[in-house]
Amino acid sequence: MGNELLIIEDNAQNFYMMKFLLEKNGFSIIGTENGRDGIKAALEHTPRAILLDIQLPEMDGYEVAAALKTHKEMADIPIIAVTSYAMAGDRENILAAGATGYIEKPINPETFVDEIRQYLP
Amino acid sequence: MNRFCSIFRKNVFFISILLLWMTLIPSFFCGTAHARIVKIGIYENAPKVFTDASGKPAGIFVDVIEYVSKKQGWQIRYVTGTWAEGLDRVTSGEIDLMPDVAPSPERKKHYSYHQVPVLSSWFQVYAPKGSGIKSILDLNGKKIAVLDRSIQKEAFEELKQGFEMNSTLITVPDYTTLFKITRDKEVDAAITNRFYGLQYAKDFDLEDTAVIFHPSNLFFAAAVGTRQDLLNAIDTHLASLKKDPDSVYYQSLKTWTAEKVKFTLPLWIQMLGLLIMVFLIAALAGSAILRKQVTVRTRQLENVNHTLQTSEKKYRELVTLANSIILRWSVDGRILFLNDFGLQFFGYTEPEIIGKQMTDTIVPEMESTGRNLNKIIRDIPDRFKAYEQHINENIRRNGDRVWIDWRNRLIVDDKGLPKEILSIGSDITPLKQAEQKINQLNRDLQQHAQNLEKQVQDRTAELTVAMEKAQAADHLKSAFLATMSHELRTPLNSIIGFTGILLQGLAGPLNEEQQKQLGMVQNSSRHLLALINDVLDISKIEAGQLSLSFSCFDLRDSIEKTVHLVQPLAQKKALELLVEIDETVSEVTTDQRRLEQIIINLLNNAVKFTEQGHIRVVCRPEKDHYLLAVEDTGIGIHPDEISGLFQPFHQIDTGLSRKREGTGLGLSICKKLIQMMNGRIDVRSQEGKGSTFTLCLPKNCEVSHGK
């Protein structure tokens, strides 16, 4: 299994920031700007983990997580929600939708990579 | 009558005794030689001569002889017997004088008389009532009783012979026997002198017949040729006695008989006179009685009349002066009477209104309420009971409408048909006006109440709308804040992320100045993040969207962890950070993250507002809760500030000059969170000396929280 991570994130700066940080720590990054492409990429590449933003155009994070979980080959791939949603129940809702982990934005660049590693199989 | 007589007889007896005594006294003193004893015969022929009830001689002859004896100084001795015995005694010389003797040719041979008669008398026939004897001829064939040897006997025998009548004469010894046998019908009639007859006929139920005959004079008689001195003396005194109307003689006549001494008058005139007298007296007495009765009756009537007048006056005054309207009206609605008060009240004079229809004067056709009063007035006599008390509108002459409370009484005629109505009325216009005013006020009040109710409803509706709007706005605000929070975090994520990357040297080495400036960017972005978090928290709490997640954890660990987090800041300001946790402090069930948020907030504030001294964290259990105090020796809080301390966006030294960092939301979030945990936060502070914030935290907030 490679060291490939899929980041589904519509904000270019955030994507770049995370990609930079993770690549500096030895990960290779695939990115998509929307859920549909994200699902396609996930099925195509079967990444080690998927970093999923919640607020996305067309399909939101919940739908994406739910869709991914319908694919057998996606069953063991952790989905880590990285989101700026901080309202009550957000964490519970996304975990219920099929996410493995939850990281609140803004991220702490000093601890972010360690947090991701924590969810990897 | 008898009783009357006997009283007189008694009196006469005493007078006689007195006279006797008076006649005796002089003779006694003058010597017995002059005292001549005169014996007088007595027989029963009242009232002329008789023996009274006490056995003493009495009568007119006795009175006369007593008077003469007294004058002459004689001493009288009476010898009682029958008429015949008396006559015999005179002739035999046994007595000196026999009274009541009528001279006749035959008697003249045996008796001597004086000249002046003592009495004159008539004979009369008496018979039982209804005898039918009207004239002397009716006595033919009848049995007639007569006194033995009397002059009546002689006279009647002469009449009998003259009229050739065949009547049987029965002689009796005295008058009493005479009347008795006549009453007992042993004889048909009796002849007697009128003196006796008048007095006693009634006692024997006899009536006097029209047969009157033989007038005769009566004298004292002596034996022929003897006692001439006595007879002369009698004549002398009788002559003088008869001249004086007040003499003993007339008094005696008056005493013994009702008959007047007008002997010269014919008997029928005397009788007539007597009858007229009796009639007159009876008439006078009757008229007096009648007059008296009339007077009494008149007085009674006057009294009754006076009482009636007084009473009537009283009632008239009552009616005319009463302070009520008193009205009488006929069944066809005409006014028959109206008292003064009523006249004055309605503004009419009596001639103006009496006889007029009520509807033309004091009653309006239509009441202001719309009732037809004309119809009601026509209705009253027929359906009277319904109108015994009736309130209606009336009208004064000047057109003023008034309200009268009428009490009506129906007056019926002899046949029981309605005749007139008596109405007594009181003016209740002010009452009615007050009532109307009250009704109006009531209506106003009701209207007002309805208005108020409507206002309240409107206002409630408005408030509901406003509240819904507010709630909607609240939701909107929350949604806005959530969105804003998200939208702010996204760029902040890049800022914080890249700053961290740069500071870590991941993008290449930094010089000292770059390092310093990027550090400032990092601080600012962290502060901005804290601000965003706090705003989000408060908005979540206020929108009721913040929910706690409870777990059981060790309180000591949480406290120590938070103290550890704040330690670097305290050290930087050279403040001593003391922790005193009681040995018994252990598990607590509450929202750990939020509790730690509170403790960090309090510790951060303590460090922030303290320049020197120490910060002390004390925790100990008390009953079912823990007390956790954060104490500092900082600037303290002015008493005026304490009340607003827990309000959102509050910070001491507000304004541009503030030197403390912070959002001003911390304490208000703390208070709201601790309240959600069923706990409490209190503050005690002395300005310039320090503050103590104390949390009261239930050991298990789930027990009472219910979540």
What spans do the regions from the language model cover?
Chain A
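Short hydrophobic/Thr-rich beta-strand motif most characteristic of the beta2 strand and flanking loop
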Residues: 26-33, 41, 103
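Charged docking surfaces used in two-component/phosphorelay signaling
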Residues: 16-24
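Active-site beta3 strand of CheY-like receiver
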Residues: 45-51, 56
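C-terminal output helix
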Residues: 107-116
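Conserved acidic carboxylate
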Residues: 9
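The feature encodes the CheY-like receiver
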Residues: 57, 66, 75, 87, ...
